């Protein structure tokens, strides 16, 4: 198989990270560590112009994410503009700040889909992880309200060593809430999750037990039909081959940060690569011609063993961001891959997961005070 320049199709999926503001303090958040340094946010008009350009290029799905997107008072206006342009719209939220009135406003504006996240299946653990004693009951109330309005009930639980052992109770909660889709997503170690990896990475035994529980529920639900879909996402750290991150670098996905930086994946801003701003270039130029979006497209950039690997068209060399975090060089093969000369870093992380005694109170939580430790501002 020869190296080649990729055929560049338009971005089908646009993620609008509206703000880094958030009322919760989850220690596994994927936001950048120095988010407190990023105080500027695109205006309503600037976001709508981004949507217009993306739709003109062929984008069809628009996700509203953050921080917590509900803190943006112009969210109904942004939803309505996206709907008028023809996007399928998705709100990814903690549910904190949501009300039945807001839900109705979003429905009237044309919002298609809402995903609510939980930290755990019980109030005590949820509060410990979110940094909010009131969060759990608010999430329960809003999940029921979402269902009552006729939206698909989509719940997300981020799993890690402190809550994965209650996965049966998590699934039971989803059944109780009459969820249509449930994402049981084991922590992916970027942003704050990478910072807290030693205290969050489950053991292999925990993962295996959780997989067994999920399979048992799938078999049961195949009979009674209580859940349409139960998705269990395992961590990269227990795989021997890397995932094809975002379907390939600059292949189908574009993220725009609160201040307007365009990225080919959520975590790319940490790389020593200059990424363009939507305030300086239009999206067509950014997608097709910018250095940042072309840096890891195709496979000509790949080192060995990726360059000669028959799986390179499947995994695209893995995650450049993960390679950078674990080796200091994004050009290296993703250490998750057993063929990588840096795979030992993954093996060491697995071993550390077996030894660690770190409790929840020893994690570094995602908040303004901790974020300021990572920049001089």
Swiss-Prot record:
Binds 1 [4Fe-4S] cluster. The cluster is coordinated with 3 cysteines and an exchangeable S-adenosyl-L-methionine. PROSITE patterns: MOAA_NIFB_PQQE, RADICAL_SAM. [4Fe-4S] cluster binds at residues 22, 26, 29. Residues 8-224 form the Radical SAM core domain. The keyword S-adenosyl-L-methionine applies. Pathway: Cofactor biosynthesis; pyrroloquinoline quinone biosynthesis. This is PqqA peptide cyclase. It comes from Pseudescherichia vulneris. The lineage of its organism: Bacteria, Pseudomonadati, Pseudomonadota, Gammaproteobacteria, Enterobacterales.
